[in-house]
């Protein structure tokens, strides 16, 4: 399993900005998800250096950010929790600076949505305690047992927790793959005719 934190954030690089999700992951993440294989430029997160992140190709394009640019850091902002009126906008946000060391490419939607970083970076940004997270991601060894594991977790955790499979989390991605497979099948069928 892997501990994760996901939160919408405001990203700023030089004079450009974008709203996306910061996803803080611990060092077990690659045992659950082989996202490092999608990194086409640079490297995956360096867990020894808290301030490193990996951005999607869509975010890289929007912000004009590359990997290993030591001259400029990626600034990440989230609103400070609280209630009521904000008297000074400069004090309304928590922020950290990060160094993009890799760029990944999966789907257009995911590439514009997620920035992956060290779990401790996300905890610092959100003022979370070291044991505070927003989710756990599991890898089930036998894919045929996924529904059973999901049912057991829902039963044991109760209604306060959301238990989703990878397909449910990334439904758009899996629908796109199915559409591509159908389109490929139809094209090959037409070629054979």
What is the predicted function of each stretch?
Residues 142-193:
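Peri-transmembrane interface segments
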Residues 1-3, 162:
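Short beta-strand elements
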Residues 5-48, 92, 116-119:
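The feature marks short, hydrophobic/small-residue-biased sequence motifs that occur predominantly
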Residues 51-52, 114:
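A residue-level structural signature of the nucleotidyltransferase/glycosyltransferase Rossmann-like core
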Residues 69-160:
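Basic-flanked hydrophobic alpha-helices used for secretion and membrane insertion
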Residues 34, 55-70:
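Short, solvent-exposed hinge/capping segments at secondary-structure junctions
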Residues 30, 59-60, 122:
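A generic structural signal for short hydrophobic patches within well-formed alpha-helices
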């Amino acid at each position: 399993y892997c501990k994760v934190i996901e939160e919408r954030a405001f990203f700023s690089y030089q004079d450009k900005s974008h709203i996306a999700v910061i996803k803080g992951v611990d060092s077990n993440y690659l045992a659950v998800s082989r996202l490092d294989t999608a990194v086409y430029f640079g490297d995956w997160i360096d867990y020894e250096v808290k301030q490193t992140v990996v951005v999607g190709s869509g975010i890289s394009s929007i912000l004009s950010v590359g990997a290993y640019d030591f001259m400029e850091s990626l600034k990440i902002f989230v609103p400070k929790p609280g209630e009521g009126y904000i008297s000074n906008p400069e004090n309304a946000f928590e922020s950290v600076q990060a160094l993009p060391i890799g760029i990944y490419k999966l789907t257009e939607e995911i590439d514009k949505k997620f920035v992956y970083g060290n779990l401790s970076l996300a905890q610092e940004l959100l003022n979370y305690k070291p044991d505070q997270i927003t989710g756990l991601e599991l890898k089930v060894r036998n894919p045929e047992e996924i529904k059973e594991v999901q049912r057991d977790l829902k039963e044991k955790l109760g209604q306060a927790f959301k238990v989703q499979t990878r397909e449910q989390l990334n439904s758009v991605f899996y629908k796109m793959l199915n559409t591509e497979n159908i389109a490929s099948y139809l094209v090959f069928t037409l070629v054979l005719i």
